[in-house]
């Protein structure tokens, strides 16, 4: 029986943080090690350039950081194909063909794109490359004939747009060439881990993220300065657990649920200080992140080897994408010279 094919990845705009780790990276490693899937993991540098075109150095520098984070958490290049988007030129031609099947109004209606346009203050001047990136994403997915795409809920509209493109292509040309992917929200993952300041999203620019590469003292400093319940002023005050960032992290990382529930009850009725709770969280995070940090340092000793992994993975992925593009070109009827020379 053929394995399911997975495509997933990240934009290289900085080092990866623990939000990425619990939101997707741990799940990727589990899927990889299950042996049930063929995994393609993309570093989407071209997509990152759609809103960083004037700062390409940021993307170049982040590429190797993301690769190191992948290897550190356990993504194995012998089991998963790690690729760099810009090294697969076939993706660009597929994007061009798919653009002919999508209207401008449909792109503008995509809820994910609309939200990101507002977030990035692009309302008055939307880069064309940014607006069409859902089509580029459809090219990424279909190039490798991915059957499964693990995503968060906010990315579901992107997968639906890819499915529409697949259906349009197959219907117009009367041939089932492209595979319609299904979106899967990984079980056991949290939605989005808030920043250490309690804001909805971790962000490098805000400085509210704990990175996989952070040293132990940096992690401790970030944990001890985390946002808690502003009304929990004295130890004896009853504290609010719900919406308390420290407890949100504990819900995510603490495996001792009995101890955690006792701690929540104690905090809620009063008598348990924030410092003690934060120290408990720090111990848990240190135990989780120390092995990852140590593996990262080992890979960092041989950066040329990391680039070799990326190059070999990209070459392997390109062979697959080239096969899909050939099918697409033949189906459209633009392989003009095949039967002549």
Swiss-Prot record:
<comment type="similarity">
    <text>Belongs to the class-I aminoacyl-tRNA synthetase family.</text>
</comment>
<feature type="binding site">
    <location>
        <begin position="19"/>
        <end position="20"/>
    </location>
    <ligand>
        <name>ATP</name>
    </ligand>
</feature>
<keyword id="KW-0436">Ligase</keyword>
<keyword id="KW-0963">Cytoplasm</keyword>
<feature type="binding site">
    <location>
        <begin position="11"/>
        <end position="13"/>
    </location>
    <ligand>
        <name>ATP</name>
    </ligand>
</feature>
<feature type="binding site">
    <location>
        <begin position="152"/>
        <end position="154"/>
    </location>
    <ligand>
        <name>ATP</name>
    </ligand>
</feature>
<keyword id="KW-0648">Protein biosynthesis</keyword>
<dbReference type="GO" id="GO:0005524">
    <property type="term" value="F:ATP binding"/>
</dbReference>
<dbReference type="InterPro" id="IPR024109">
    <property type="entry name" value="Trp-tRNA-ligase_bac-type"/>
</dbReference>
<dbReference type="InterPro" id="IPR001412">
    <property type="entry name" value="aa-tRNA-synth_I_CS"/>
</dbReference>
<comment type="function">
    <text>Catalyzes the attachment of tryptophan to tRNA(Trp).</text>
</comment>
<keyword id="KW-0067">ATP-binding</keyword>
<feature type="binding site">
    <location>
        <begin position="201"/>
        <end position="205"/>
    </location>
    <ligand>
        <name>ATP</name>
    </ligand>
</feature>
<keyword id="KW-0030">Aminoacyl-tRNA synthetase</keyword>
<keyword id="KW-0547">Nucleotide-binding</keyword>
<dbReference type="GO" id="GO:0004830">
    <property type="term" value="F:tryptophan-tRNA ligase activity"/>
</dbReference>
<feature type="binding site">
    <location>
        <position position="193"/>
    </location>
    <ligand>
        <name>ATP</name>
    </ligand>
</feature>
<dbReference type="InterPro" id="IPR014729">
    <property type="entry name" value="Rossmann-like_a/b/a_fold"/>
</dbReference>
<dbReference type="Pfam" id="PF00579">
    <property type="entry name" value="tRNA-synt_1b"/>
</dbReference>
<dbReference type="GO" id="GO:0005829">
    <property type="term" value="C:cytosol"/>
</dbReference>
<feature type="short sequence motif" description="'KMSKS' region">
    <location>
        <begin position="201"/>
        <end position="205"/>
    </location>
</feature>
<dbReference type="GO" id="GO:0006436">
    <property type="term" value="P:tryptophanyl-tRNA aminoacylation"/>
</dbReference>
<dbReference type="InterPro" id="IPR002305">
    <property type="entry name" value="aa-tRNA-synth_Ic"/>
</dbReference>
<dbReference type="InterPro" id="IPR002306">
    <property type="entry name" value="Trp-tRNA-ligase"/>
</dbReference>
<dbReference type="InterPro" id="IPR050203">
    <property type="entry name" value="Trp-tRNA_synthetase"/>
</dbReference>
<feature type="short sequence motif" description="'HIGH' region">
    <location>
        <begin position="12"/>
        <end position="20"/>
    </location>
</feature>
<protein>
    <recommendedName>
        <fullName>Tryptophan--tRNA ligase</fullName>
        <ecNumber>6.1.1.2</ecNumber>
    </recommendedName>
</protein>
<comment type="subunit">
    <text>Homodimer.</text>
</comment>
<feature type="binding site">
    <location>
        <position position="140"/>
    </location>
    <ligand>
        <name>L-tryptophan</name>
    </ligand>
</feature>
């Amino acid at each position: 029986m053929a394995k399911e094919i997975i495509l997933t990845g990240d934009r290289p705009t900085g080092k990866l943080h623990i939000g990425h780790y619990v939101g997707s990276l741990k799940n990727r490693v589990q899927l990889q090690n299950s042996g049930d899937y063929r995994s393609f993991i993309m570093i989407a540098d071209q997509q990152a350039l759609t809103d960083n075109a004037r700062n390409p150095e940021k993307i170049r520098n982040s590429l190797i950081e993301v690769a190191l984070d992948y290897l550190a958490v356990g993504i194995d290049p012998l089991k998963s194909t790690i690729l760099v988007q810009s090294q697969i030129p076939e993706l660009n031609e597929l994007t061009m063909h798919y653009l002919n099947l999508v209207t401008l109004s449909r792109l503008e209606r995509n809820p994910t794109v609309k939200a990101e346009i507002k977030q990035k203050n692009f309302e008055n001047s939307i880069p064309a490359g940014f607006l069409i990136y859902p089509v580029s994403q459809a090219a990424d997915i279909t190039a490798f004939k991915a059957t499964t795409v693990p995503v968060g809920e906010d990315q579901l509209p992107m997968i639906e747009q890819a499915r529409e493109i697949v259906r349009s292509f197959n219907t117009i040309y009367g041939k089932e060439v492209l595979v319609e992917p299904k979106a899967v929200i990984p079980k056991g993952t949290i939605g989005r881990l808030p920043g250490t300041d309690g804001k909805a999203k971790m962000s490098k620019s805000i400085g509210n993220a704990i990175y996989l590469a952070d040293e132990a003292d940096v992690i401790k400093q970030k944990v001890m300065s985390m946002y808690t319940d502003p009304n929990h002023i004295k130890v004896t005050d009853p504290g609010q657990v719900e919406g308390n960032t420290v407890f949100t992290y504990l819900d995510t990382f603490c495996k001792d649920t009995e101890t955690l529930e006792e701690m929540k009850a104690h905090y809620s009725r009063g008598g348990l200080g924030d410092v003690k709770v934060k120290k408990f969280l720090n111990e848990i995070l240190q135990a989780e992140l120390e092995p990852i940090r140590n593996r990262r340092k080992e890979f960092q000793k041989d950066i040329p080897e990391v680039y070799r992994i990326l190059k070999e993975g990209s070459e392997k992925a390109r062979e697959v994408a080239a096969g899909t593009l050939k099918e697409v070109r033949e189906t459209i009827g633009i392989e003009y010279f095949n039967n002549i020379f």
